[in-house]
Amino acid sequence: MIMNPTAIKHVVVDGHSLTLESFVAIARYNATVELAPSALEAMKKSRALAEKIAAEGRVAYGITTGFGEFQKVAVPKEMSNQLSTNLILSHCTAAGEPYADEIVRGMMLLRANALCGGVSGVRPILVEMLLEMLNKGVTPVVPQKGSLGSSGDLTPLAHMTLPMLGKGEAMYEGVKMPGAEAMAKAGIKTLDTLVSKEGLGMTNGTCAMTSVGALALYDTICAAQLGDVIASMSFEGLTGLRNAFDPRIHQVRGQKGQMLVAANMRKLLDGSEILDNCQKDRVQDAYALRCIPQLHGACRDALDYVREKVEIELNAVTDNPLMFLDDEAVISGGNFHGEPMALPFDFLGIAASELADASERRTERMVNPALSNGLTAFLTTQAGVNSGFMIVQYAAASMVSENKIYAHPASVDSIPSSANQEDIVSMGTTAARKAKMILQNTQDVLADELMTACQAIDIRRRLNTHGQGMTPLHEALYQHVREKVAFYEIDREIWPDIRAVEAMIRSGELLDIVKEYIPDFE
């Protein structure tokens, strides 16, 4: 079950209690944040240990040494502040279009939450500043390309940190401006410098990939729920056979997602006059209809797995080295490595791609007179002079094929960096970015199917070969679409209608209607 993040208005950031919904509430819907007192105290103690280590001149990576291949180079304690600041300045090398504000806000939140763990040795002011920027709407400009996903998301996080130093660029009140100007307009005092360990503390972590991937995950969960609904409308338009959703079939297999989707289909199709009165002239349907629980259910199981991993990472400490107060140990490790996220985000993209595959096949069945159980060719009333929905299916097929390219796993790739000190990397940020691109295509493919299903229902009613009545929910969704997209009597400019339905898919308004009729819908 996924709750509505817009209901969450305020979140206490403590390092261990973020959920997917509270993350989305802050990153996308601007829920306010505050620092938990317990996290503040933990960071103060951790910072005291970092200062003690620096003062004693103990060998500690990134505090008294250089970075990467320069780990063997000793840095005098009087240069430790410059070391941290230089790390930010030298690492902001990203390229490409900037991330959307919601993704950067997610990065800021995740960095703050990780530092709240109290083992990174940074001053609390860094977290306080990040949370103040979130509350006041200062969003650093962060280009999308340049992260290998190990050592974490160094490049994007360096760009994220620049405005805190009065550098770089930021968005404020919808306008891009120099970072110093944005901070001044918001009334946030910038830092003159970072101090020892803080360069690593701000950049060593998986915050960019996790922000991109977590938002894509939330949207894919919503798309999967809506995928069941749209599939059921197509099923009704194609007069499918409901016996494929008999619970006994699914219980004997025992796959959780499959059983959930089968239950959804039974709820969604209950009370359909069209299906109650259709001719039973076949024993079973094609896979795209009969196997909706198996196809969509497998995607649901994949999303459950990805959610489990993401919610761990939302509250993870992904810095290096880490400091433990009980024995004053400073331990170098690899929590920054993105592999634990790279594989799930590849899986996320594959699951979203499969949803689109199934959707496009249902669209094809509705427009193909050989497969549609009596619908007109391409759902037009004047064949030949009108092409109807012929090219709607083309567009869906194009996006499905594009998804197959994007679905190739990023995590199987690696490339050495930093003179082979960082010799195997995760490409987790690439995996997350690909998953988002696949999701966007999938949302558009579902929009094509929904438009086609509404046209198919109208054609079915005109032919009057079965009862006229859809289920009450389907009727409500149909009417909602028809408020903006009229029946296609003759060909007309179609792209504005496609954009309108795509907007319905992305806004969440269709799921709101579903939950009015089926409150426990999952």
Language-model region placement:
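Glycine-rich, flexible loop motifs
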Residues: 4-21, 25-57, 84-143
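C-terminal auxiliary extensions adjacent to catalytic cores
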Residues: 2-31, 35-42, 46-49, 54, ...
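Conserved, non-catalytic sequence blocks in retroelement Pol enzymes and Pol-derived host proteins
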Residues: 119, 148-150, 384
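Alpha-helix capping at helix-to-loop junctions
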Residues: 112-116, 132-140, 148, 166, ...
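Polyanion/phosphate-binding surface patch
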Residues: 56-58, 73, 261
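Cysteine-centered functional microenvironments
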Residues: 142-147, 326, 330
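A broadly conserved amphipathic alpha-helix scaffold signal in soluble, globular proteins
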Residues: 128-135, 155-158, 162, 225
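FAD-binding core of FAD-dependent oxidoreductases
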Residues: 61-75, 79-83, 90-115, 143-165, ...
